[in-house]
């Protein structure tokens, strides 16, 4: 991991991050990047280092407008894909970025488009003097574009990109489920030590969660296990009897509860 100050833009940290990874003896061959990292300089850097990547194209880019102007018949059966319970349309286009052949995946989410259109029309009708180009915004509603250095089967495009989101959700557990709020620290060693503890805690949390799902959530399991008590003596700890629910949870977690623990 790498700790970066919040006032440093994402687009400027990629080069140093790759350099640090290389100095650790790790060969980076894949990258999943949010739109904040997109720039011609970063794309060129990834290509020079032969790193395959997938990134979201910012809507402010000219390339975004060019591609959305060419979507044509995207809302047809042949471009339909399922991602979980979401039905979407995904269309592949071959493009050139930094003189390199790449693949653009234009994704249209019908539900998001309907929501965006409703909000835009509501605002336009309530504020007729509003200067925003409503027609253009409606045209872009529900659309986003992913750029990849390698060709990806349409059914695998969103799972590949949303791996990043899954990682972000994992760190969300550190703030919500685990109450691992950042400490007030004043040195890089302290924040790196804190992040190491977060990684260790999250690793344990995820391992336990995987064993419990889909029958039980971690929140429900931890609430149930609060009822587990123990008596503490001078030289030993004796856990009290488990109820049926606690036994089931420990069985799923493959954890054996000892009859006695030394102090």
Predicted stretch roles:
Residues 1-263:
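Anion-binding and metal-coordination hotspots
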């Amino acid at each position: 991991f790498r700790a970066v100050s919040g006032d440093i833009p994402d687009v400027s940290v990629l080069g140093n991050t790759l350099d640090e990874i290389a100095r650790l003896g790790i060969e980076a061959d894949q990258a999943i990047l949010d739109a904040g990292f997109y720039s011609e300089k970063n794309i060129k850097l990834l290509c020079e280092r032969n790193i395959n990547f997938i990134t979201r194209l910012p809507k402010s880019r000219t390339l975004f407008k060019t591609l959305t102007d060419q979507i044509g018949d995207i809302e047809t059966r042949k471009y339909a894909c399922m991602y979980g319970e979401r039905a979407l349309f995904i269309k592949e286009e071959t493009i050139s970025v930094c003189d390199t052949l790449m693949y653009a995946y234009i994704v249209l989410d019908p539900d998001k488009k309907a929501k965006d259109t409703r909000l835009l029309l509501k605002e336009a009708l309530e504020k007729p003097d509003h200067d925003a180009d409503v027609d253009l915004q409606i045209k872009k509603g529900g659309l986003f574009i992913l750029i990849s250095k390698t060709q990806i089967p349409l059914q695998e495009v969103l799972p590949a990109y949303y791996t990043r989101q899954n990682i972000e959700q994992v760190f969300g557990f550190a703030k919500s489920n685990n109450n691992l709020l950042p400490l007030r620290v004043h040195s890089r060693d302290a924040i790196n030590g804190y992040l190491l503890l977060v990684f260790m805690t999250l690793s344990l949390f995820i391992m336990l969660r995987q064993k419990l799902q889909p029958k039980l959530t971690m929140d429900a399991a931890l609430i149930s296990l609060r009822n587990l008590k123990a008596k503490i003596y001078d030289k030993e700890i004796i856990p009290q009897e488990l109820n049926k629910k606690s036994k089931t949870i420990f069985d799923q977690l493959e954890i054996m509860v000892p009859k006695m623990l030394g102090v």
